[in-house]
Design a protein with these regions (language model features):
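Glycine-rich phosphate-binding loop of ATP-dependent small-molecule kinases
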Residues: 1-363
Length: 363
């Protein structure tokens, strides 16, 4: 975004409004092109309370076809989400091809709060950020365009805006005790935000765009500029036949399994029927015990079956689950993806079926 253009446009409110409207028209055009080319777009808008996230998002979507986007406002996870992997609820909201997903707060808000509260120690926080980078990289490798905005305001400006909200009966509810507590720890949050940038502001991946939002009109103009530039670049890449993902893909990953290769597997019968019945009954009883233990300790388990047609997957699953509590497991048959699944990232349909804590999912 050219600072000269922003400065010139800022000279008059009318001039800036014209520039914003022009950006909006271009954004609407690019939305149509992304839809035609099947480009999924994910936009993250983060910032401290009263930084103007809602205003910026509202200005983003005004020129867009409302059938082509969805805004997700991320609050604290509900009971069901708490029982799932951290990124589960965000995977479910990732955009399909030709649609745009806009997040008012995101997976980052959880990590900022967890760092401030001490809910996650240094090692756990490092792992969480590793998971976030992998999540974003997987989406990018699948063709998703990701833009991340962070709106900055000073503590003084935040205090003024919070007071204004509190003074209006229609908006006072937005200033909760949690919001005031975050404001009181402004410096701690700034430190956590800087740590977030260190972990996830990678120019080759999905860089952060930091925007001063003291003047919301200027901030809107700047955010629209970044969004238009990114979508224009992606559309041009697609038209030129270039791959959507430009980074280096991970290759040559080591195999951590000690399982023998199929060529070396012994497929001959090794047990007589009586011995088999005795062993399987003992092992099914043990599986029942372990299933109860998984539930007690709130440990989720995913079991994956692969094999040729008629190789015995169904029979094996039936024996596996014979003594398991049916309320604690689910079998997910996997076939060719349908049209909805094809329009999403390859892993989307599997993430949506991940088990709750203490439950078992068998694919």
């Amino acid at each position: 975004m050219s600072q000269d253009i922003l400065t010139e446009a800022s000279k008059t409110k009318k001039g800036l409004r014209r520039q914003i409207d022009e950006r909006g028209r271009e954004l609407a055009y690019l939305q149509r092109k992304c839809r035609e080319l099947g480009i999924p777009v994910l936009v993250v808008v983060e910032g401290l309370s009263a930084a103007g996230k809602g205003t910026i998002i509202n200005q983003m979507i005004q020129p867009l076809d409302p059938r082509g986007f969805k805004v997700s406002c991320i609050a604290s996870p509900n009971r069901d989400e708490q029982l799932r992997p951290f990124l589960w609820r965000f995977w479910r909201r990732t955009p399909s091809a030709n649609r745009m997903a806009i997040f008012d707060r995101s997976w980052y808000r959880n990590l900022l709060d967890a760092e401030i509260s001490g809910e996650l120690n240094e090692s756990e926080l490092r792992k969480a950020y590793t998971d976030v980078r992998a999540f974003e990289r997987q989406l990018r490798e699948g063709g998703t365009t990701i833009l991340k905005f962070f709106l900055r305001i000073t503590k003084k400006e935040q205090a003024v805006r919070l007071a204004t909200l509190q003074g209006n009966p229609a908006t006072a509810w937005r200033v909760s005790d949690a919001v005031l507590a975050r404001h009181a720890r402004y410096k701690d949050y700034q430190k956590a935000v800087d740590h977030m940038f260190e972990e996830t502001d990678l120019e080759e991946e999905a860089p952060w765009r930091r925007i001063d939002s003291k003047n919301l009109s200027n901030a809107t103009f700047e955010a629209l500029g970044y969004l238009v530039d990114a979508l224009r670049k992606r559309v041009e890449q697609c038209k030129a036949g270039n791959p959507l993902f430009e980074g280096k893909r991970l290759t040559g990953l080591p195999c951590f399994s000690d399982a023998p290769s199929l060529k070396k597997s012994d497929l001959s019968l090794g047990l007589e029927k009586e011995a088999y019945r005795e062993i399987i009954q003992a092992r099914q009883s043990r599986i029942q015990e372990l299933h109860n233990e998984l539930y007690r300790l709130r440990i989720p388990l995913v079991i994956v079956y692969e094999g040729w047609d008629a190789s015995g997957k169904g029979g094996n699953i039936r024996r596996l689950t014979e003594q398991m509590d049916p309320r604690g497991y689910e079998v997910i048959p996997v076939s060719a993806p349908n049209d909805v699944e094809k329009a999403h990232h390859y892993l989307w349909r599997f993430w949506t079926e991940f088990p709750k804590a203490g439950h078992v999912t068998i694919f």
